[in-house]
Amino acid sequence: MKKILSDLEDKIKNKTSIICLTEDYCINPMWAHYADNHNGVCIEYDFKNISNFIFKILCFPIEYVEKSNNTLELSALFDDNIKTNPVWPLRLVLRKSHDWQYEKEWRLIVSQFFKDFFYEKNHGDVYFDEYYSDKHYIKFIKPKSIYLGLDIDLKDEEKLIDICKFRKINVYKMKKDKSGYNLKSEPILEF
């Protein structure tokens, strides 16, 4: 059983890429953990008005749970779920401990499982090759805004502002609020 589960895990890893997103760019620990301790950037996308089918089917909220029950979940992979629902095995990468729920995370999953499912089921006008390749690249939407970290390097800041000016992307700089504990953004460049 361990060998089967290990092989399945390898298959999922080799055929899947994940982009992690959050609903809130002002979470201090997120800047510390994922943006090089406030030296990096946060990129904002507007998914509300997206008409692109691929993003509607590939973006999932994280489920925050008290306790992982992967053994029961993995055993269920051997029934018909996997044949009829390509998202089912991806549930394994859509759960995290409830300790992380402050992240308000979503994951964009780019997986061969989806491609195989849609070709096999012939889902109308879905042409995966337009969005996806075997190298896990997808055409992504234009960022709405870039948020520069509190401690971003000045040269990096200038380069990003130049790029955003050319691409007509809003730029904001993160600052501490009056309390000194919370973050807020101040506009540098808006379109």
Task: Give short role names for the model-derived ranges.
Residues 1-191:
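Catalytic-core loop-and-flanking beta/alpha module that positions acidic residues
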